[in-house]
């Protein structure tokens, strides 16, 4: 609190004060300076709370105490210090120093309170006060414990007092005799080193040199309008020293400090950088993002930029100006002429340089494009010549393909004759070379042709060893093909078709009896498999990729089987047996591979379709065959003896399975021996016997079937 300003109260001057020695004056100055620092610190802390009502009440109490102290001073009593009271032991502390007695009451009031005719520069009223703080000190305890630094405590300096006066901690009567500026202080800040830049509030605002010169700084402080609350000093209980408290003393943190970087100035700077600095930087901030923050651009005022200046072209040899020469000269590389223009140069050396440059540019110049005429012109040669050239080229191509194919066959196949389909192609080619005839387009009805096929020319599994007497009513061959795949047709009726890979696909050859035979094989260079076989006698066969018969045709009809060999369809030709009770024939379409397809519409409407590279070739192989005596043809010709034997074996197998089931049901007793076959097996046996009598099979085969289906007794 600031001292009460006004008219100084009259009183007697104490002229009997003793002169203190120099040692006591020095201690008092140091203690006063320490007290000033401590009080400023406490004032800063309590100023934040902003309790104005308590400040006014405290102000009134302090003024009353000051008035009472001023009255006691007038009685001529000596300066007395405040006795310290130890809270832990409850004993008053011993006094150490005394206030100097060189200043009486009147001199103090002259120095503190302004009056008429007061001259602050007068040396008469300039007391020797060092580091005096605001006189509004109080002994009241602070309302709460704030986070203030832990300072080293010292015993207060007790001053002499009158007999019978109580201690300062228990009563405030000892403070009524003297102004608060002369009271002793509890804290000592001399042992604490605090940075002045970090904590400006802990240091005095008035410099030491100003305080020692005059008392004008006291007047400026007292003239402030805002009254600051400074609590009284209270002696706190000293806690036992521990390692944690000792570490806490080194951390001097001001809670009002807005910047968190104050931790860097402390003893544990390295620990702060490693543990806290990175996390503190990531704290969220208020405001625009950092990318939008203002960044001061660096100034380049010290750099002097010169304007670009165009140099005048000058000759390197003689130094003359070349602007007029370059204005007339065409330096573009696109307009280079064979004979460049001659320019008047300034000197001979420059002229030689230009000539050399022109020669080099002519050397590296690309040749000019030669344009051809695109106007219409007459064709080269006649149409006949162009057609002959195409036929000749096609013939050479086919010869090369056939030569390559025969070379592969002769290399892979042995010359010995075997009964398989591999030697059949070679034998057929030999027949083509030996026998030749004119192409047959039509023959008169009634002519009997006997087709005899030797065993060496066909595989044994084809079963073409018997002779057939048939009458050829019409033999007609139709051929349509393109030139984009291998095709060759000679005068004797030989036809060759090759796959796009060059392998032989279809070959059609004439035979000895004015007929033909056609073979279709797969697309492989070595050991090709036969896919289909057709002849003019009316017998044809097509095969699955696994070798089983797919479609079989004879002069009476045909049958259709699956890959497992199971018969799916059977039919007879309508021309051979019109009165038959069997269903009429339905067309059959087969795809032997990706290039060849078979179409069977009627006996005389059988064709092969070859499709490759977008072109198609069709070969008609249908033959109309008529029998002389149709009544001699046995009924149900489509059922052979082998088929009937298979049915008999099937009935026998089912009967054995039935007995095996009985053994499993009655394993101990022999009742299964007395069990008869199921009724459905007996019915199948009767039907098979009737079928055998109607089919006209041989007697030997009939006896074998009866033995198979006969139930053992």
Swiss-Prot record:
Localization (cell): Nucleus
Family: Belongs to the ERICH6 family.
Feature: compositional bias, Acidic residues: 44-61
Organism listed in the record: Mus musculus
Location of region: Disordered: 1-177
Keywords, sorted A to Z: Nucleus
Biased composition (Basic residues): 1-17
Composition bias type Low complexity, residue spans: 165-174
Gene: Erich6
The protein, known as: Glutamate-rich protein 6
Polar residues bias: start-end ranges: 133-150
Residue ranges that the Swiss-Prot or TrEMBL entry lists as coiled coil: none
Bias-annotated ranges (Basic and acidic residues): 18-43
Pfam families: FAM194
Cross-referenced InterPro entries: FAM194_C
GO cellular component, one term: nucleus
């Amino acid at each position: 609190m600031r001292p009460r300003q006004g008219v100084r109260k009259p009183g007697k001057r104490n002229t009997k004060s003793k002169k203190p020695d120099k040692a006591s004056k020095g201690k008092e100055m140091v203690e006063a300076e320490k007290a000033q620092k401590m009080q400023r610190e406490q004032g800063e802390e309590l100023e934040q709370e902003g309790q104005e009502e308590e400040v006014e009440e405290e102000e009134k109490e302090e003024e009353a105490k000051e008035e009472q102290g001023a009255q006691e001073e007038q009685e001529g009593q000596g300066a007395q210090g405040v006795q310290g009271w130890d809270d832990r032991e409850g004993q008053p502390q011993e006094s150490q120093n005394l206030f100097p007695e060189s200043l009486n009451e009147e001199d103090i009031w002259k120095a503190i309170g302004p009056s008429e005719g007061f001259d602050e520069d007068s040396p008469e009223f300039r007391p020797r006060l060092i580091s005096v703080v605001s006189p509004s000190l109080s002994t009241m305890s602070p309302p709460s414990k704030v986070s203030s630094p832990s300072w080293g405590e010292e015993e207060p300096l007790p001053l002499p007092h009158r007999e019978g006066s109580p201690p300062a901690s228990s009563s405030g009567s000892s403070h009524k005799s003297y102004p608060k500026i002369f009271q002793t202080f509890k804290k000592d800040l001399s042992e604490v080193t605090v940075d002045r830049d970090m904590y400006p509030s802990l240091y005095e605002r008035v410099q030491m040199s100003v305080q020692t010169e005059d008392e004008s700084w006291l007047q400026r402080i007292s003239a402030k309008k805002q009254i600051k609350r400074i609590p009284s000093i209270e002696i706190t209980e000293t806690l036992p020293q521990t390692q944690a408290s000792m570490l806490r003393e080194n951390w001097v943190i001001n809670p009002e400090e807005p910047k968190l970087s104050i931790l860097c100035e402390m003893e544990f700077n390295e620990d702060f950088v490693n543990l806290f600095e990175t996390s503190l930087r990531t704290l969220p901030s208020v405001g625009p993002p950092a990318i939008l923050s203002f960044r001061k651009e660096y100034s380049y005022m010290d750099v002097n930029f010169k304007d670009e200046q165009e140099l005048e072209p000058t000759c390197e040899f003689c130094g003359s100006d070349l602007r007029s020469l370059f204005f007339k000269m065409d330096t573009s590389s696109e307009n280079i002429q064979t004979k460049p223009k001659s320019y008047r140069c300034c000197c001979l050396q420059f002229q030689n340089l230009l000539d050399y440059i022109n020669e080099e540019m002519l050397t590296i110049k690309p040749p000019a494009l030669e344009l051809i005429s695109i106007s219409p012109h007459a064709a080269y040669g006649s149409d006949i010549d162009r057609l002959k050239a195409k036929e000749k080229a096609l013939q050479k191509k086919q010869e090369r393909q056939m030569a390559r194919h025969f070379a592969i066959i002769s290399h892979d196949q042995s010359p010995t004759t075997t009964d398989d389909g591999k030697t059949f192609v070679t034998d057929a080619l030999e027949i083509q070379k030996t026998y030749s005839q004119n192409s047959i387009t039509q023959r008169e009805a009634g002519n009997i042709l006997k087709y005899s096929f030797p065993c060496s020319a066909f595989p044994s599994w084809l079963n073409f060893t018997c002779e057939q007497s048939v009458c050829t009513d019409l033999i007609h061959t139709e051929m349509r093909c393109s030139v984009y795949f291998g095709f060759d047709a000679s005068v004797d009726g030989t036809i060759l078709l090759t796959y796009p890979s060059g392998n032989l696909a279809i070959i059609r050859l004439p035979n000895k009896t004015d007929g033909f035979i056609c073979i279709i094989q797969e697309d492989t260079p070595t050991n090709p498999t036969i896919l289909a076989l057709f002849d003019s006698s009316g017998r044809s066969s097509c095969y699955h990729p696994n070798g089983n018969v797919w479609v079989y045709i004879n002069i009476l009809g045909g049958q259709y089987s699956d890959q497992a060999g199971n018969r799916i369809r059977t039919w007879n030709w309508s021309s051979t047996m019109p009165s038959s009770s069997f269903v009429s024939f339905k067309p059959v379409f087969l795809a032997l591979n990706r290039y060849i397809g078979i179409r069977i519409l009627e006996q005389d409407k059988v064709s092969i379709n070859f499709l490759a590279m977008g072109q198609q070739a069709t070969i008609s192989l249908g033959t109309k065959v008529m029998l002389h005596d149709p009544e001699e043809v046995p009924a149900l010709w489509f059922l052979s003896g082998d088929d009937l034997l298979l049915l008999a074996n099937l009935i026998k197998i089912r009967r054995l399975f039935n007995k095996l089931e009985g053994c499993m049901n009655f394993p101990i007793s022999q009742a299964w021996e007395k069990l008869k076959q199921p009724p459905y097996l007996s019915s199948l046996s009767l039907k098979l016997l009737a079928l055998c009598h109607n089919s006209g099979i041989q007697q030997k085969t009939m006896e074998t079937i009866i033995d198979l289906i006969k139930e053992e007794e």
